[in-house]
Regions:
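Structured catalytic-domain cores with a bias toward divalent-metal coordination
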Residues: 2-194
């Protein structure tokens, strides 16, 4: 697990980004554990990334995830009570007795699928919305999201939620991830989007 605090506000106090790897890094038992942390959501990435969770999942087939817990604040200003379920779940996971065997119930957590990732192609890239919007801000189908030197981006069929919007990245880097709520299915002991 790669633990972070988000730079911006979010619809969810905590959420996870599950990497897209060639191995089985999305076992139902792991998702059951994640639900015990009381995360609000898990996003299912669909492309490789430069994260620690992707690297360990891809090269070591570990159950990997990046957790965004709360929002960055000055030391001592975060409400640690909100982190207690995560602390308790991790403590139980690493205890001598091991983690209790529980079934994953997808109703315990919101699941999102990645619909696409926008990358900055030129220095003309800009969002048409305030880049400071909270993670998981939802845009209805057809809403103009961004422009990049004549390339226009609109919210897709069914609408899309934006995660990690940042127009100030270098050319070639991710400016945001776009997501939609999804149902899941278990295939070969792996959680997959329906």
């Amino acid at each position: 697990m790669d633990l972070h605090s988000a730079i911006r506000k979010s619809k969810y106090f905590g959420f996870g980004v599950s990497p897209s790897c060639t191995g089985n890094v999305r076992k139902p038992e792991f998702f059951a554990f994640l639900a015990q942390t009381k995360l609000g959501a898990i996003t299912l990435s669909d492309i490789p990334s430069s994260t620690f969770s992707w690297y360990t999942g891809e090269f070591y087939e570990s159950q990997s995830i990046t957790l965004e817990l709360g929002k960055v604040a000055r030391f001592g200003e975060n409400d640690h009570k909100l982190l207690q379920p995560t602390f308790d779940a991790i403590s139980e996971l690493i205890s001598i007795d091991g983690y209790k065997d529980i079934e994953f119930d997808e109703s315990d957590i919101d699941i999102y699928k990645s619909t696409r990732t926008l990358f900055k192609k030129t220095n003309d890239f800009h969002f048409t919305f305030d880049a400071g919007v909270p993670n998981f801000t939802f845009f209805e189908k057809g809403i103009h999201l961004a422009s990049d030197n004549g390339q226009e981006y609109y919210a897709a069929e069914g609408g899309e939620a934006v995660v990690f919007p940042n127009p100030n990245v270098q050319i070639g880097h991710r400016t945001c991830m776009l997501m939609q709520p999804t149902q899941i299915k278990i295939v070969n002991n792996q959680v997959m989007k329906s």
